[in-house]
From Swiss-Prot:
PANTHER family: 39S RIBOSOMAL PROTEIN L12 (PTHR45987), LARGE RIBOSOMAL SUBUNIT PROTEIN BL12M (PTHR45987:SF4). GO terms for cellular component: cytosolic large ribosomal subunit. CDD domains: Ribosomal_L7_L12 (cd00387). It comes from Corynebacterium diphtheriae (strain ATCC 700971 / NCTC 13129 / Biotype gravis). Keywords: Ribonucleoprotein, Ribosomal protein. Homodimer. Part of the ribosomal stalk of the 50S ribosomal subunit. Forms a multimeric L10(L12)X complex, where L10 forms an elongated spine to which 2 to 4 L12 dimers bind in a sequential fashion. Binds GTP-bound translation factors. This is Large ribosomal subunit protein bL12. NCBIfam families: L12.
Length: 126
């Protein structure tokens, strides 16, 4: 028997009715012990982690770099972190990358990021 190309197979499928194609798929699954539904299940499972990321409610505000305006960033850090002295804030800024806030809600994290970036820092939310 001559080997058929993909194009020849597709042309043969185009000439078949839906019932004939359905019967072909069932027989193909039986002969090769595969199912046509397996890729759909894998795709659905792959979508689940993306949904989990969208539902994230707690964020860490991470100071990546203080930038050129280190004094302004130190002041911003002292405003954001209660009870932090000047020395501790300076050490925190100079030790970047460091988490400034951990487990903050989205609004607080966004506000802190904006404040630090306004002061000249490079900040990421994780």
């Amino acid at each position: 028997m001559a080997k058929l190309t993909k194009d020849e197979l597709i042309e043969a499928f185009k000439e078949m009715t839906l019932i004939e194609l359905s019967e072909f798929v069932k027989e193909f699954e039986e002969v090769f012990e595969v199912t046509a539904a397996a890729p759909v299940a894998v795709a659905a499972a792959g979508a689940a982690p993306a949904a989990a990321e969208e539902e994230k409610t707690e964020f860490d505000v991470v100071l990546e770099d203080a930038g050129a305006k280190k004094i302004g960033v130190i002041k911003a850090v002292r405003e954001l972190v209660s009870g932090l002295g000047l020395k501790e804030a300076k050490e925190l800024v100079e030790g970047a990358p460091k988490a400034i806030l951990e487990g903050a809600n989205k609004d607080d994290a966004e506000a802190a990021k904006a404040k630090l970036e306004e002061a000249g820092a490079k900040v990421t939310l994780k």
